[in-house]
Amino acid sequence: MTTWLLLVAAIVSEVTATLSLKAALDRPGLYALVVVGYLASFTLLAAVLRRGMGLGVAYGVWAALGVAATAVLSALVYDEPLTLLMTVGLVLIIGGVLLVEGGSQAAGTRPDPLPHPGAHDGAA
């Protein structure tokens, strides 16, 4: 699985857990899904970092797209308000994420391959 697909999976897990948190208020059995969703999200985010994606990019994309997806889906699922001003804010968040990612690519930062287990830097 590519690093970006792992990040998308982390975002989907986090959004699922967050939406389930509201549903669990009325159906406590859903708290298990909340816990599993957050554990999966952080595990996948750690895998993304392990593959070499920069923390600023990975966390920025994860948090921003999680906020945007949660806002849109909570409007659809829970009939929560999504005003024009909120929508403009979400567009700005997504634009900011694109700028951060573009800046990362311009700086030449790419995910590094994992070091071979047992490899060392030669220091004694």
What are these regions (language model features)?
Residues 1-124:
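Polytopic alpha-helical membrane proteins, predominantly small-molecule transporters/carriers
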